[in-house]
């Protein structure tokens, strides 16, 4: 039997009791565990290792809403467990981070190990293969069926793969909208979007590339900044112009660039879907 790949569980916990419980779990079924009481250290770790994390554990505190905002705006969507105080009031209604999050109270810490698997399973069923390290799919028996999903690069298949994932975004903070940013912040965001979109185009027809993750990252940033479809189109046209000039210098045909209309349609389709789902149902 092949050796299983380690899971990485990353926690932000403030109370020693929860930290001790995580340490206890680390000696049982979880192969790798890191947790922090400092929000800054937690965010720094995520910046460096977000693609290797299988599940987040967040103890609810005064700074947790800001941490969740950070996760959303950095396009970091992962399986998650939120831990609330057991008394006196019940946990506030969610979702807080996304609709597949698992809620526990401090008197349910004995369930934490099992709920980690529940959080991963629920998130992968929400969106097969999205934002979860591939080895996690094979680590948990409940996910074996989901692990057989073959990521296709046809528009119709990719729409099917990510429909559930798109539904996790249900609120936006207008303070972060593009039109309210400073000129410097606008330039920074557009540079980020151009860089991500260029990677999407270059990897789009590469079956080994994680293009879905790139599209999710691009669309998430655009959605939370209220970027218009026309701005996305402008980014696409600018990039195609750059490629066209390079092809001309190399004496090659520009016809290949027509294939990337599918890339543009794919990205715009998902951005429009996110905008559609952000409209309250009663409207």
Curated annotation (Swiss-Prot):
Keywords: Biological rhythms
Ranges for domain KaiA C-terminal: 173-281
GO process annotations (BP): circadian rhythm
Region (PsR domain, not required to form KaiA:KaiB:KaiC complex, or for a full KaiC phosphorylation cycle): 1-146
Phenotypic consequence of residue 204 to F: Induces a change in the structure due to the absence of the hydrogen bond between D-266 and Y-204
Disulfide bonds: none
Region of interest (Flexible linker), ranges: 164-172
Transmembrane segments: none
Gene3D superfamilies: 3.40.50.2300, KaiA/RbsU domain (1.10.1240.30)
Pfam families per UniProt: KaiA, KaiA_N
Residue ranges of domain KaiA N-terminal in the record: 3-163
UniProt cross-references to InterPro entries, sorted A to Z: CheY-like_superfamily, Circadian_clock_KaiA, Circadian_clock_KaiA_N, Circadian_clock_protein_KaiA_C, KaiA/RbsU_helical_domain_sf
Signal peptide (residue range): none
Superkingdom of this protein's organism: Bacteria
An MF annotation (GO) of this entry: identical protein binding
Annotated phenotype, changing residue 266 to A: Weakens KaiABC formation
Record text about domains: The KaiA C-terminal domain mediates homodimerization and formation of a stable complex with KaiB and KaiC. The N-terminal pseudoreceiver domain (PsR, residues 1-146 in these experiments) is not necessary for most KaiA functions, while the linker region (residues 147-179) between the 2 domains is probably required at least for KaiA:KaiB interaction. Undergoes large conformational changes in the KaiABC complex which inactivates the second KaiA monomer, preventing it from activating the KaiC CII domain. The PsR domain binds oxidized quinones.
Assigned protein family: Belongs to the KaiA family.
Role played: Key component of the KaiABC oscillator complex, which constitutes the main circadian regulator in cyanobacteria. Complex composition changes during the circadian cycle to control KaiC phosphorylation. KaiA stimulates KaiC autophosphorylation, while KaiB sequesters KaiA, leading to KaiC autodephosphorylation. KaiA binding to the KaiC CII domain during the subjective day yields KaiA(2-4):KaiC(6) complexes which stimulate KaiC autophosphorylation.
Assembly with partners or alone: Homodimer. The KaiABC complex composition changes during the circadian cycle to control KaiC phosphorylation. Complexes KaiC(6), KaiA(2-4):KaiC(6), KaiB(6):KaiC(6) and KaiC(6):KaiB(6):KaiA(12) are among the most important forms, many form cooperatively. Binds to KaiB and KaiC, the N-terminus (pseudoreceiver domain PsR) is not required for either interaction. 1 KaiB binds to one subunit of the KaiA homodimer. KaiA and CikA bind to the same region of the KaiB(fs) form and therefore compete.
Record's protein name: Circadian clock oscillator protein KaiA
Organism: Thermosynechococcus vestitus (strain NIES-2133 / IAM M-273 / BP-1)
